[in-house]
Amino acid sequence: MTKQSIRAREFKRIILAKKFFAKRIKLKQIISNIHSSSEERWNAIIKLQQLPRDSSRSRQRNRCSQTGRPHAFLRKFGLSRIKVREAAMRGEIPGLRKASW
């Protein structure tokens, strides 16, 4: 199991990303707009850099919902490969069975 502090940190990152999502999009549009002046771009870049680091979506880590494991995460199930295999062997995932050819 993952430590509670790490889970809390991930939860904080999710909340911050939602909070600053619209602001980040607006600033990125100003930066990428070819019609905006260089001064507007620089101001937008500085404002973007002043936002909290954890408000960026790329700082979030996908984790297994049961164990909190960060590696070998399968998005389709929201679980790590180990827990998907265990659930599949018990027949808890409909339509999923062991491959044989």
UniProtKB/Swiss-Prot annotation:
Annotated keywords: Ribonucleoprotein, Ribosomal protein, RNA-binding, rRNA-binding
InterPro entries xrefs: Ribosomal_uS14, Ribosomal_uS14_bac/plastid, Ribosomal_uS14_CS
Subunit composition and interactions: Part of the 30S ribosomal subunit. Contacts proteins S3 and S10.
NCBIfam families, A to Z: PRK08881.1
Transmembrane segments: none
Family: Belongs to the universal ribosomal protein uS14 family.
Superkingdom as given in the UniProt entry: Bacteria
Recorded name of the encoding gene: rpsN
Purpose of the protein: Binds 16S rRNA, required for the assembly of 30S particles and may also be responsible for determining the conformation of the 16S rRNA at the A site.
GO BP field: translation
Pfam families: Ribosomal_S14
Entries under SUPFAM superfamilies matching the protein: Glucocorticoid receptor-like (DNA-binding domain)
Name of the protein in question: Small ribosomal subunit protein uS14
MF (Gene Ontology): rRNA binding; structural constituent of ribosome
